[in-house]
Regions:
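Donor-binding and catalytic core of enzymes assembling or modifying cell-surface/extracellular glycoconjugates
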Residues: 41, 204-295
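Secretory-pathway luminal glycosyltransferase catalytic domains
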Residues: 26-31, 67-205, 209, 301-304
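A short, glycine/small-residue-rich beta-strand->loop->alpha-helix junction that serves as a flexible
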Residues: 36-46
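Histidine-anchored nucleotide/phosphate-binding helix
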Residues: 44-56, 200-207
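Nucleotide-activated donor-dependent transferases that construct or modify glycoconjugates
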Residues: 15-38
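Boundary detector for helix-to-coil junctions that initiate low-complexity/charged tails
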Residues: 1-16
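Short beta-strand segments
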Residues: 64-66, 165-168, 216-219, 281
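Acidic, PIN/NYN-like endoribonuclease modules and their adjacent C-terminal/linker elements
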Residues: 293-308
Length: 308
């Protein structure tokens, strides 16, 4: 009985390898990022955008493992799904990001390419903006409509007012003597040395740039929202806390954006389709803490955003 089971396993394994090497023999090109899910949502979007840009420029499909950790399935993104072992056997060239700013050599790799890095600059994907705006609509139409409806209701409540989103990133950025886990990654207590909190003065100064506005204030948890109520002291403020995808879309559908040093709010602002939008961002040198002070940050903040 054991012998028969082992024979079956061996045949399945041989069949899999045969399919893999058959694909290689036919020189089927693709691009993949097998570790795309090992970061939080905003960083996953940077990685996906770079993948998509590479895919379109080199005319190769995107292949990803069916990884429950990545959250791309929340969006209207199309890609081929293959098991991780398939990717490990099939990819024959690798691109690893060596520096934080834009690298034009990224697009020169061909055939079956595995990429790895953060790709945190629009220079990798600015020219496919409209495509990404379509891809990054929520797969759950009800959630997308909920965000749109929420913005409409706020505009009805505050007629004639500009809708300005403020994202106050706290959560794991708050200094703590205890480790922190978001369910994906375990963070050490010194995380604030990597990602400093933006000051109250930053948010107040940014808000002061907008006249005749209502401010939608978003943060990580109910506790963080309470902190905002007690400390920000911004007039005409509405405090919002839904599930993160609806918050993300509400920020995107606002008229203007004030962001934190957060890839989550970076993406909500970047996807904002208002032609007259004003986006205020922390200065590039304040994005990371001393732990990442050696990073070249010149390409992170789009040129048409105001750094404060």
């Amino acid at each position: 009985m054991i012998y028969r089971i082992n024979r079956k396993i061996i045949k399945t394994y041989e069949k899999t390898l045969k399919a893999v090497f058959s694909m290689r023999a036919r020189n089927k090109s693709f691009v993949t990022f097998s570790k795309i899910g090992l970061v939080r949502l905003g960083n996953q979007l940077f990685r996906y955008a770079a993948l998509k840009s590479y895919s379109l420029r080199n005319k190769v499909p995107i292949i990803l493992p069916p990884d429950t950790e990545h959250r791309l399935n929340n969006f209207k993104i199309e890609y081929l799904s293959k098991p991780l072992y398939w990717l490990n056997y099939s990819s024959d060239s690798k691109y690893v990001e060596k520096k934080f700013n834009f690298d034009s050599n990224f697009f020169s790799f061909h055939n079956r390419t595995e990429i790895n890095g953060f790709f945190q600059t629009e220079k990798y994907f600015k020219d496919i903006r409209q495509i990404l705006q379509t891809d990054l609509k929520l797969a759950n139409c009800k959630k997308e409509k909920k965000a749109i409806e929420n913005i409409k209701l706020i505009k009805q409540e505050f007629p004639g007012k500009k809708i300005v989103s403020i994202h106050v990133r706290r959560g794991d950025y708050v200094p703590s003597s205890k480790p922190y886990s978001d369910g994906i990654t375990d963070y050490s207590p010194d995380r604030h040395l990597k990602h400093p909190l933006m000051t109250v003065d930053y948010f107040q100064s940014a808000a002061a740039r907008f006249q005749n506005a209502v401010f939608l204030i978003f943060s990580d948890t109910n506790q963080d929202i309470e902190w905002c109520k007690e400390n920000l002291n911004i007039k005409n403020a509405v405090y919002i806390h839904n599930e993160d995808l609806i918050d993300f879309k509400m920020m995107q559908f606002s008229d203007h954006n004030i962001i934190s040093n957060s890839s989550f709010s970076w993406w909500a602002a970047w996807l904002n389709d208002n032609d007259r939008k004003q986006i205020i961002s922390p200065k590039k040198e304040n994005w990371f803490g001393e732990f990442y002070s050696h990073y070249n940050m010149n390409d992170l903040i789009p040129r048409d955003w105001e750094q404060l």
